[in-house]
C-alpha cells in the first residue's frame, strides 16, 4: 500500500472524546496501540494512520486536506467553520454522520445575583468565552451588542475575577457553574461528536476504505442502540406480546419441543425494554425473558 493510499484520521490527543473515538475505531475492527509519546499511531491490520492532535486543530486539518477524516465535536467544527468563512479560508468538509457520544451544550451563564430575563439582559455587558464565533452569531441573531473577553480556559472564573459580567461556556451537569457562583440561563448550541471527511478527491482505494469504515461505524452505533430479546410466549397471547416489544420488526417465532401451546420469540428491538414492559409481558404469560446487548450489526 503506497503512502498516498493510507487513510489518515485525526482524533483528539487526550480526554473523553479521545477515549470514545479510539473505542469506536476498535469496535470497527481497526487494530492499533497508542504510544503516548507519539502523535501518530499506525493500524496493524488496515492502511490507516491515526493522528493524535488538539481538538481545535482537527477541523482545519480536514478542511485543508492534510488528513482525510476526523472525529470532532460539532461545536468545535462549527466554531472553526465560522472563523474560516470570516477569513475567506477553505471551510468545507463532508459531515458523514453524527456519533452517539460527546454530548454537550454551549450555554450562557451569569452570577447568581444577576437578574436575567432573556439574552437582552446582557446588552452592552462583557461576556467571557472560548467560543467567540458561536457566541457572536447567536448575539447577532438576537440583535444584541456586547463586549467579548476571549479566554482559552477557566472561563467560569471570569465573573468572580472581575474579567466579565457573564460567560458562554460548555456545560454538562452545571456543577462547575454552581461552584463558581453562576447559573445557566440559555443554551445557544447543542453538540455531539461527528465524523467529517475532506472534500478533496480521494483515490478509489482510499474512498473504498472510507466507505468501509463508515459502514462499520453505522453498524456499531445501530448495535449500541438495539437489544436482542428472547422469551417464551403462549400462542394464545402471541399477538399481544409481539405488540408490546418496543421497536421490534418481524420477530422470529419458533416452536418449542414437546409444547404446542408455547413458542420462542427472538427479536431485535431498537428501544430499551423497561421493567414495566417486562412485567406486562409476564402478565400475558411470557417467561424466560432475556434482554441482551448486541456487539455488531450489519445489513
Swiss-Prot record:
The record's listing under Gene3D superfamilies reads:
3.30.70.120, Periplasmic binding protein-like II
Q: Where in the cell is it found?
A: Cytoplasm
Q: What is this protein called?
A: ATP phosphoribosyltransferase
* Pathway(s) the chain acts in: Amino-acid biosynthesis; L-histidine biosynthesis; L-histidine from 5-phospho-alpha-D-ribose 1-diphosphate: step 1/9
Per UniProt, what is one Pfam family of this protein?
HisG
Could you list this entry's UniProt keywords, alphabetically sorted. Answer: Amino-acid biosynthesis, ATP-binding, Cytoplasm, Glycosyltransferase, Histidine biosynthesis, Magnesium, Metal-binding, Nucleotide-binding, Transferase
Question: What protein family does this chain belong to?
Answer: Belongs to the ATP phosphoribosyltransferase family. Long subfamily.
Location (main, coarse): cytoplasm
Q: Which reaction does it catalyse?
A: 1-(5-phospho-beta-D-ribosyl)-ATP + diphosphate = 5-phospho-alpha-D-ribose 1-diphosphate + ATP
Q: Name one GO molecular function term.
A: ATP phosphoribosyltransferase activity
Any single Gene Ontology cellular-component annotation: cytoplasm
* Gene Ontology process terms (BP): L-histidine biosynthetic process
The known regulators of its activity are described as:
Feedback inhibited by histidine.
Question: What enzyme category does the UniProt record give?
Answer: transferase
Q: Which cofactor does it need?
A: Mg(2+)
Q: What's the stated role of this polypeptide?
A: Catalyzes the condensation of ATP and 5-phosphoribose 1-diphosphate to form N'-(5'-phosphoribosyl)-ATP (PR-ATP). Has a crucial role in the pathway because the rate of histidine biosynthesis seems to be controlled primarily by regulation of HisG enzymatic activity.
Q: What is its EC number?
A: 2.4.2.17
